[in-house]
Curated annotation (Swiss-Prot):
GO terms for cellular component: cytoplasm; ribonuclease H2 complex. Pfam families: DUF3378, RNase_HII. It is found in: Cytoplasm. It catalyses: Endonucleolytic cleavage to 5'-phosphomonoester. It comes from Streptococcus pneumoniae (strain JJA). This is Ribonuclease HIII. The gene is rnhC. PROSITE patterns: RNASE_H_2.
Length: 293
């Protein structure tokens, strides 16, 4: 999904609104002055003066403000915040979310270091470069432990809304450190509509517009940095949990997880499983059935 952020003059904003006034729609986001639903695009006009255009027709409507596609360089030449999460697809281990602030002058350093999407790097490479990234790059890391995850899922949150809460909090805390991004990109895990819906229940908010983009870790180094740090945090948590229980906990949610889960269930009961795993996964029932054989 195309996403374009602009900061036009107030005169141009008013001209745009007058031209597309029939497309105005309500928005629950308190930082959005005007929201328009247009054919193949949505337009959010923020109180800060920035405009976020999203959808296949984003470039078409952005041209109203003088935007030209050839000028777009995937946002890499901007100081930006990128976020990503790791652990949402793994039965064992917590959920790690990281927001990282990267400026253009850091790009060469990051490329030479071999920064890329954590899914394309070996765990050994991640454990090697993550400490360097943590030291050199301004970031905010959050880890929701399995026990805390199980406590909030089904009560206040579901598997999607809990990620919205963590991404929002990571960005909020990073902004509190004084960074000034010209763009904020989230590696999309849900639609913009769903994100805004769940965001409404969060107390900590900020006025900066955000962009949810699929496969953002391959487009933005800031997202790639977050992906690496989050993967490192997840792996460290997985090791620590396994060490406390005396088991090597596998990543993912396959049959290996079912087998280890049944062993932990037999040794420690549901309390032990709740300590190290996300109980709403189907692996929990599969582990129980293994013990019944």
């Amino acid at each position: 999904m195309a996403s374009i952020t602009l900061t036009p003059s107030e005169k141009d904003i008013q001209a745009f609104l007058e031209h597309y006034q029939t497309s105005l729609a309500p928005s629950k986001n308190p930082y959005i002055r005007y929201f328009l639903k247009l054919p193949q695009a949505t337009v959010s006009i923020y109180t800060s003066g920035k405009i976020l255009l999203q959808g296949e027709g984003a470039e078409k409507y952005a041209s109203f403000f003088g935007y030209q596609a050839v000028e777009q360089t995937s946002g890499q030449n901007l100081p930006l915040i990128g976020t990503d999460e790791v652990g949402n697809g793994s039965y064992f281990g917590g959920l790690a979310v990281v927001a990282a602030f990267v400026t253009p002058d850091q790009h060469d350093f990051l490329r030479k270091l071999g920064v890329g999407d954590s899914k394309t790097l070996t765990d050994q490479k991640i454990r090697q470069i993550a400490p360097i990234l943590k030291e050199k790059i301004q970031h905010q890391a959050l880890l929701l432990s399995p026990s805390k995850y199980n406590e909030v899922i089904g009560d206040r949150y579901n598997a999607v809304s809990v990620k919205v809460a963590l991404h929002n909090q990571a960005i909020y805390l990073l902004l509190q450190k004084g960074v000034q991004p010209e763009k904020i990109v989230i590696d999309a895990f849900t639609s913009a509509k769903n994100y805004d819906k769940y965001l409404a229940q969060e107390a900590n908010r900020f006025s900066n517009p955000i962009s949810l983009e699929e496969k953002a870790e391959g487009k933005y180094l800031a997202v790639a940095v977050s992906s690496v740090i989050a993967r490192d945090l997840f792996l460290e948590n997985l090791e620590n949990l396994g060490r406390e229980l005396g088991y090597q906990l596998p990543s993912g949610a396959g049959t290996a997880s079912d087998k280890v889960a049944s062993q932990i269930l037999q040794a420690y009961g549901m309390q032990g499983l709740s300590f190290c795993a996300k109980l709403h996964f189907k692996n929990t029932e599969k582990a129980k059935k293994r013990l019944e054989r």
